[in-house]
Amino acid sequence: MFKKLSYLAIFLSSAFIYAQEEEEVVVTGSYIAGSPTDGASPVEIVGRDLIDNIGAMTASDITANLPIDSGSENNADSFTSGATQGRTNINLRGLGLTSTLVLIDGRRVTFSGSIANDGSAFVDTSQIPTIALDRVEILKEGAASIYGSDAVAGVVNYIFRRDFVGFETDITRQQIEAGSARDDRVSFIYGGEFGDSNVVLAYSSLDRSPMLGTEKELAPMGISGLGTSFRLLSGTTTAAAGHPYAGTYTHNPNGLTDPPNTYIRDPNCVANKGIVLADGRCGFKFGPRFNIVNEENHEQIYLSIKRPLTDEIDFNLDVLDATTNVWDNPQSPSYPALTFLSLAKLIQPGTGGSPFDKALLWYGRPLANLFPSPLAPRYISRDRISLGLTGTFDNGFDWDFRVTRSAEDAYGLQPDTGTSQLEDAIAGKGGPTGDQTFDLFIPTNNSQELIDWLRSDQETWTDVELEVVDFVVTGEVGNVAIATGIQLREESIDIDRSANSLVVLDANGNLVTPANMIFLGGGIEVDTSKSAEAIFVEASADINENLEIRGALRYESLEEESTVDPKISLRYQASDNVVLRASVSQSYREPTLAQLYASDVGLEGIQDYNTNGETVGNATFIRIAAKANPNLVPEEADNLNVGVIWTLDDFQAKFDYWAVDYTNVITKEQAQGIVRYTPQSTKVIRTSGTLAGVTTSYFNADYVETDGIDIELTYSADIGPGTLGLGLNATHMMSYDIPILGVKTDVVGLFNQDNFARSMPDTKAVISANYLSGQHSVAAYVRHISSYKTNAALNSTAQSLGIFNADGSIDSFTTVDMQYTYAVDAENVALTVGLKNAFDEDVPYVYDATNWSYDPKHHDPRGRMFTLGLKYMLD
């Protein structure tokens, strides 16, 4: 197939050999020269000035300035985004991380090796060095007819400063007021011309110090009932005098109505930094142990070389190398012993340090409140190289050939305790010598040697790679502008695991042999690949001096499927001041390799329910098995956009109505929804009546139907000695309909903890003002996220805290950023001072089981931040 399409590309290029010459100016969403930003397709451009004015330390700061983004993962979140620590992403219209196509200089980039909790794959935007950015172009509609798979919600194109000439260096510190956490960034960019060659080199390094969970109370619900407790199942038992547990305990035959006589908790629970729960257990408060911001280092190197090879052919090379190290990422001292919540694993008298004369069921963890937190580091290395040739045929028709390879190598460690080691140690056969006993009742009696021997860390090595060949020809035939070309893609994923974290699944994806870990679930190893070949054609013509029509068609051949995706758009100049535009298109997204083949077991905080819909106990972290599904079919979407652009002198207004009808949506079953709505399902795993796990799988959901409105207002005027700029950028979601238990349900304005949609406030907006006068520049940005709500009923613990709104509402969140820059012309120096979240607005509280009690996918928890930057420039 690759060879056939290569021959076809040569034929297509020769077919237009007599076309007329026209200089190429390309905007994201089209390959045709001359596509304007006020054209038929809605494109938002974040320019270099705006990147500087918002004080963007990283690409995620740019994402935070985009109201169209909804539900991305750009804040550290050990509870619901643990596997993706150190990475960032973008989620246009809340349609899913995988439904936004991310490009670098118009070319594809490999997905990250780690996936989000909901199974979404994404391009890691943390690899982008902001100093090397010229602009970011955001296409706000589907574009599969041009770019292929994944361009359902839109396209985000990071365009680098490939023509930069000069030298610029920047040193910036961003200090969080609450605590000692800060970001220190050092970066530079150099561009020079050497004969006919142009070379650009950029480097950026960001060191981020941690913001500890103790510095802000953002996880008050981070309490586990599996701390230091045991359960007596029948009769009476006695512990001898002299032992901390000394006394007689009697089973309550009426259940748990008299907890002290049913659960036997650590008698020194509070003194040992535990927390006594309502049912009598000694709980473990893990929330403050996790960082709000991790200690990280990010480094990026970018190189661009351009030079002519002949009078007709130019050579260009782009190289990007990026590394991320998450150094700390503290966890609980040990995780709950889920594998011991079984009648087959009762703690017998005389074992595990038990002072009792009857067997007990262990509700705990090997190491709890008195022990330090182990670390779960992440190391990520990415490289991208793009080699291109561009030229012009003798008649002036342009061609562009490029080969791009991008890859990511990642390593992650998650500490845990070995099931087999712990069983041996409880039986008195533990440690290097095989004769040590682990004391479950007085953990401080255990030696460090034995504690170290119990460790069974989950280690994962992930390699992903994407190779893309693009060949595009553009020009004109008569009065019709045409672009056509081919694309060849090959994608691979290789996941290796430590032996203790491997699981065995049967043919149906059910767990046969678990990992040798008491809590973490492990997974299978994967080494697979897939390829795709595509051909497309795009055309544009002026029907008259006021009406332009564009059309595109792309055929893409996948390994199991094929798809044809059309698009047609219109631009009508209704008057000197008014432009009308409209577009309709079809888009698709193919399943990712991880969704097809990479079954694994993760962790989620889940609230249990009974068949009456009532909560049972407190939420706790349990194993969530996610079964891959090789039978997934591609998603398909119909996209519509209708807009008007009104320009009057220095004022411009853009209003766009958009709609996406999505079918065969690929998602993972939502574990909380399964437990809440079908608590007796075979997918819900219980051990001795205690919720222990949920089995989920990837599937093609019926549909998502969503629509909304985008608004962009800009105004500029000369006022006094300078220029004033004002702006409003807002997105309002009118509906987001999905099936819940077979019923079409609008989930806009909901937290959506029990379905596959992400949290979804209906309105996000940014109001901006900047004033430039000589050497002085002042900018201010007001960011608003509307209120929304959760439909989860508060449990007794949440009610007792008194911090959550009783009706489930989540307050709106509005922050103000301000920045002042003074340019010292004679010294080529610029000094910048700034405030982010200037009024120190607290994030609104969100009741979300045992996770963070705020929404990391929308709200930045860091509070007020001070910024000081120094920039030096040479032409």
Where are these regions (language model features)?
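Extracytoplasmic beta-strand/coil segments of soluble accessory domains associated
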Residues: S35, A64-R108
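N-terminal periplasmic "start-of-domain" segments of outer-membrane beta-barrel proteins
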Residues: E24-I54, S60, S112-N117
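C-terminal beta-signal and terminal closure region of outer-membrane beta-barrel proteins
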Residues: L413-P415, Q421, S585, G602, ...
